[in-house]
């Protein structure tokens, strides 16, 4: 049993809520062992980058907020969070620089306006995402927001859902356009229709097993199930509970739903879901999604005559408390007091009458949060980065803005170019589905370790989903404006995606040959790795980290056995690699962990082979 499972077995994460007032009264040092992690069940996250302070993550189903909620969030951020608010790629917000003493007041104030922070971290169902233009866009098959609300009400605060093997992401949309990256979700309900006699029934097809992290992008696969809106929340619940009861609880980097599906296959998993709900499920209907997407930035006609929604770009998702207060005012003055957050970290204000559009677009706030931004800035998405995240390898948000503005000066793009930044392999910036995806790493330049990225191209979600292909490796961030200029000028991302799909197999792969020892493969040369750094390689399907320390090469498994972070991005110190996420130290020679004696890395032999080395167990 891994350490997180032991922690959950001793005490349910929700139970720490009763201890929060005492911890707030007695201070940070009073928090008992294990409860720092359990606080994540309450959306309260300690951050080593901000010693003595926490991040709080709010649950905002489908990204829908009221003016009153924005005022509450903005006011709390200004008074207790140094005025800083981040919009995430799950349509929710995060407050920074929070003291434990202030947490009870924040929770009470949020509850007053109908918001909670429950189950926004750790092994829970995270915020339900969906099309932010539900009920507004003429491109939807059905309004899916009631399903998102019903499912959220089913699991929030319910201990039946608080001990999953791993985190669980759900997207529910009735829109034809692919604005939610459904293929990256553990469960995705996407619009479909089915003929029943002479009637056409609108509902959802069910996709399962998508992910970005834990070893890379896996496109969610069809469960071959059509579900009607009134039964959709029940089916989502059944899928989650099958995962709860049958998912692995061993190595945390291999226990997402995707791995259970790889082990069982979709047919067996579907049978388990049917057994839980006690009936056979309908076969999938006709997929209604289009091979296009939208970012919701700009002025869009609603299906309601005379009304519009205005999509505002929030650069890298970061706003101030004062900006949220002003946004609340605008939503009331020009709309109906509602704002909606998007998975691209932006915001839309719905229900703006034609007669008020000119006044709204002339508001001073819209010179900062623009409805008509330039192309590169418009498509920019960034995770939190090393500034506040324990897992990140590099700074992302400030870098992303710096690079985007440099590119705008070099190549004024006429349409949006989706450039997504992820600071670590967890992939919170959705880099795998972008035109250009940037994944944080580190490299050496003139003997100095600097921020760098691996560059991916051609990622896409939707009915023709494709994973971005790595085209460049370990590019120093300072060189990115020059390097990316050519890619942005080229701009034929749709053509790249078509070429990627042509390379993908269109027929089932032949059965594997009988198991035998894999022959050694020459995989690495000493000059490929800078002294004091590591590099991830793949040998016979296994991801391995190769390090160069004091002139010697060492090979270990790449994924940290503690929480699954990529060790190749870690620092080397005295013959040990230090995990970039939580600081666990592993001996490069033996794999022994100095931080937790129960953990150990698998090590590999490097055998000289001509100019390079082969990896052997």
Where are these regions (language model features)?
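Small-residue-enriched alpha-helical segments and adjacent helix-cap loops
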Residues: 2, 6, 25-33, 53-201, ...
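Rieske [2Fe-2S] iron-sulfur-binding domain
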Residues: 528-617
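Charge-rich, low-complexity segments
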Residues: 1-42, 180-182, 232, 236-285
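Mobile "lid/hinge" segments at catalytic clefts and subdomain interfaces of large enzymes
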Residues: 162-270, 432-494
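Short Fe-S-cluster ligation motifs
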Residues: 416, 423-426, 447-474, 584-617
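Short flanking/linker segments adjacent to small metal-binding domains or redox-active Cys/His motifs
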Residues: 248, 468-523, 598-617
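Terminal amphipathic helices with adjacent charged low-complexity linkers/tails
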Residues: 97, 101-114, 244-303, 308, ...
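Flexible, glycine/charged-enriched surface loops at secondary-structure junctions
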Residues: 83-87, 122, 158-165, 243-261, ...
């Amino acid at each position: 049993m891994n350490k997180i499972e032991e922690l959950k077995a001793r005490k349910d994460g929700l139970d720490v809520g009763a201890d929060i007032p005492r911890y707030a009264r007695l201070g940070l040092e009073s928090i008992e062992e294990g409860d720092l992690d359990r606080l994540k069940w309450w959306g309260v996250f300690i951050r080593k980058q901000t010693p003595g302070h926490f991040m709080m993550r709010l649950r905002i189903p489908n990204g829908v907020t009221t003016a009153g909620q924005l005022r509450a969030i903005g006011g709390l951020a200004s008074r207790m969070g140094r005025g800083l608010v981040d919009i995430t790629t799950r349509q929710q917000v995060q407050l920074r620089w929070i003291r434990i003493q202030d947490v009870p007041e924040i929770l009470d104030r949020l509850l007053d306006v109908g918001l909670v922070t429950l189950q926004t971290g750790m092994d829970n169902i995270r915020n339900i995402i969906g099309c932010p233009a539900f009920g507004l866009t003429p491109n939807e098959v059905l309004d899916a927001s009631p399903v998102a609300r019903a499912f959220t009400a089913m699991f929030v605060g319910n201990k039946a859902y608080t001990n999953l093997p791993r985190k669980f992401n759900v997207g529910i949309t009735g829109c034809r356009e692919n604005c939610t990256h459904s293929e990256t979700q553990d469960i995705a309900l996407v619009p479909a229709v089915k003929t029943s006699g002479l009637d056409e029934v609108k509902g959802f097809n069910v996709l399962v097993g998508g992910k970005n992290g834990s070893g890379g992008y896996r496109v969610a696969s069809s469960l071959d199930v059509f579900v009607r809106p009134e039964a959709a929340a029940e089916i989502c619940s059944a899928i989650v509970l099958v995962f709860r009861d049958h998912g692995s609880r061993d190595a945390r980097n291999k226990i997402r739903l995707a791995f259970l599906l790889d082990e069982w296959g979709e047919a067996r998993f579907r049978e388990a879901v049917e057994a839980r709900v006690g009936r056979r499920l309908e076969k999938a209907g006709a997929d209604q999604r289009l091979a296009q997407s939208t970012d919701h930035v700009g002025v869009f006609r609603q299906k309601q005559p005379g009304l519009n929604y205005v999509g505002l770009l929030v650069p890298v998702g970061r706003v101030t408390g004062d900006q949220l207060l002003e946004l609340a005012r605008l939503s009331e003055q020009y709309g109906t007091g509602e704002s909606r957050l998007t998975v691209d970290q932006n915001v839309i204000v719905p229900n703006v009458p034609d007669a008020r559009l000119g006044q709204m677009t002339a508001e001073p706030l819209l010179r900062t949060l623009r409805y008509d931004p330039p192309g590169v800035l418009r498509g920019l998405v960034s995770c939190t980065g090393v500034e506040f995240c324990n897992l990140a390898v590099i700074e992302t948000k400030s870098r992303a803005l710096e690079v985007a503005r440099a590119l705008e000066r070099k190549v004024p793009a006429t349409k949006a170019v989706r450039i997504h930044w992820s600071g670590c392999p967890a992939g919170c910036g959705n880099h795998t589905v972008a035109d250009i995806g940037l994944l944080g790493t580190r490299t050496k330049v003139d003997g100095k370790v600097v921020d760098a990225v691996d560059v991916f191209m051609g990622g896409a979600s939707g009915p023709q989903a494709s994973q971005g292909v790595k085209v460049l490796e370990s590019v120093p961030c300072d060189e990115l404006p020059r390097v990316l200029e050519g890619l942005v000028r080229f701009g034929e991302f749709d053509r790249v995606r078509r070429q990627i799909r042509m390379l993908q197999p269109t027929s089932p792969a032949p059965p594997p040959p009988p198991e035998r020892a894999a022959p050694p493969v020459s995989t690495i040369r000493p000059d490929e790795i800078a002294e004091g750094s590591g590099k991830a390689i793949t040998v016979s399907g296994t991801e391995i980290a190769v390090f160069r320390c004091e002139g010697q090469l060492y090979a270990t498994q790449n994924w940290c056995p503690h929480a699954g972070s990529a060790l190749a991005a870690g620092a080397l110190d005295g013959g040990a690699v230090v995990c970039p996420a939580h600081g666990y130290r592993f001996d490069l020679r033996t794999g022994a962990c100095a931080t937790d004696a129960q953990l150990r890395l698998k090590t590999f032999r490097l055998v000289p082979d001509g100019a390079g080395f082969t990896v052997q167990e």
